[in-house]
Amino acid sequence: MLHGEAIEALIVGGGAVAARKARALLIAGARVRLIAVEVGTEVRELAGAYPKLHFEERSYASSDIGNAQLVLASTNDRGINRRVADDAHAAHRLVNVADDPARGNCRTTATHRAGDLVIGITAGGVPSAAVRIRDSLAARFDDRYAAAVATLASLRRRLIDGGASDEWARASEALIDDRFCERVEQGTMESEAAQWG
């Protein structure tokens, strides 16, 4: 997974797939430039909500790669997607190709977020399967897990910053064992973690 706030991304395409990929990058904090002959309503709405999204309605040019670290080819034209991928490879950039994942050198994930817990799913180039799996996992890994992760992160910081890294090692071994999910789902993680802090 990428730390979005440090990423400048280029998306070529303006439809639903491009909008979905843009949304994920924007939520992660990336700066996104989108080029498309025609930009759909979803992209326009995203641009209104996220100042880090800039779009241009025009044809793609090889020079659009520019300083982008991540390039996403998301048009409904295989030829354009192939050209975008070739240009990105020539510029030594990470590239994702929506209609031909093997042509790219990275994949995007169907992502579920609950606080600082982030679960990313890929499914061999079958995005609808990844989405179905993500939705199934999201039903279980909810705000209870977000709270547990926040509690553990706070405990870890407190112990390590206080010079007690050995104590953190023992605490994490005790709290993040085979009963971790059981503790979270029964609501006992916070009280058990408090015994270590």
Model-predicted regions and their roles:
Residues 1-38, 43-46:
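Hydrophobic, well-ordered beta-alpha structural blocks that scaffold small-molecule cofactor pockets
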Residues 6, 66-68:
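Alpha-helix C-terminal capping/helix-to-coil transition sites in glycosyltransferase folds
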Residues 32, 55, 94-95:
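Hydrophobic beta-strand scaffold residues
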Residues 36, 55-59, 99:
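Short loop/edge segments at beta-strand edges and connector loops
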Residues 47-66:
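Glycine-rich, highly charged phosphate/nucleotide-binding loops
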Residues 70-76, 81-107:
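ADP-ribose/adenylate-binding Rossmann-like module
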